[in-house]
């Protein structure tokens, strides 16, 4: 049974699932869909064409689905899609997509968004990610599964962050971070592998293969894409293939300095 405060504003047309809780002074717009078991605390607002999955917990004063902060936005039909079992903390801001970026911002499941996190238009985030307090993702950023962004860290438009990658707190990232890697600094550069994250879900033998590929990529002194192609010719590791394919597809480049290796 849903529990909706009489002080909340639920516009006609909004779809509210089973066992949903909505606190006082919340606003749920007419185009919104709230999945079963989701809890929305007081003073939070769900705007626009926003679809929220099951068992999410949205804390107070979050603003979800408000118009994208893009000067080209002219009221087009755009949307925000959020998966299941996410925790979205206080004063977070999530924008929908834009016409020029595909029209959708897409958030996966089992993610933690700490206070004051900003998710810009057309962002795509996978599953099991953590964004610490005041992490800021500009438009079109993409994050793979299990990626971590430290607090007070801005991410430039169009940056891609691979699965299991980590960007340290108080950094500023303007280039792509490959899977399994760790970046830190302003501007952030690679600082090795995110071994703590890897050990949670990846077998030791696979980690050793990732380590070997990482050193080969960044110590060879040759163009990264040449080395990536060479590694792909002889590896059977799914994780190493993911690392090398990311390097081959990067558009913003990989921020690394050989001296740190």
Swiss-Prot record:
Its main location: cytoplasm. Its EC number is 2.3.1.129. InterPro entries: Acetyltransf_C, Acetyltransf_C_sf, Hexapep, Hexapep_transf_CS, Lipid_A_LpxA, Trimer_LpxA-like_sf. Involved in the biosynthesis of lipid A, a phosphorylated glycolipid that anchors the lipopolysaccharide to the outer membrane of the cell. It comes from the Bacteria. PROSITE patterns: HEXAPEP_TRANSFERASES. One of its GO terms (cellular component) is membrane. GO terms for molecular function: acyl-[acyl-carrier-protein]-UDP-N-acetylglucosamine O-acyltransferase activity. It is found in: Cytoplasm. The lineage of its organism: Bacteria, Pseudomonadati, Campylobacterota, Epsilonproteobacteria, Campylobacterales. Homotrimer. Keywords: Acyltransferase, Cytoplasm, Lipid A biosynthesis, Lipid biosynthesis, Lipid metabolism, Repeat, Transferase. SUPFAM superfamilies: Trimeric LpxA-like enzymes. This is Acyl-[acyl-carrier-protein]--UDP-N-acetylglucosamine O-acyltransferase. GO terms for biological process: lipid A biosynthetic process. Belongs to the transferase hexapeptide repeat family. LpxA subfamily. Pathway: Glycolipid biosynthesis; lipid IV(A) biosynthesis; lipid IV(A) from (3R)-3-hydroxytetradecanoyl-[acyl-carrier-protein] and UDP-N-acetyl-alpha-D-glucosamine: step 1/6. HAMAP family: LpxA. It is an enzyme of class 2 (transferase). Pfam families: Acetyltransf_11, Hexapep. It catalyses: a (3R)-hydroxyacyl-[ACP] + UDP-N-acetyl-alpha-D-glucosamine = a UDP-3-O-[(3R)-3-hydroxyacyl]-N-acetyl-alpha-D-glucosamine + holo-[ACP].
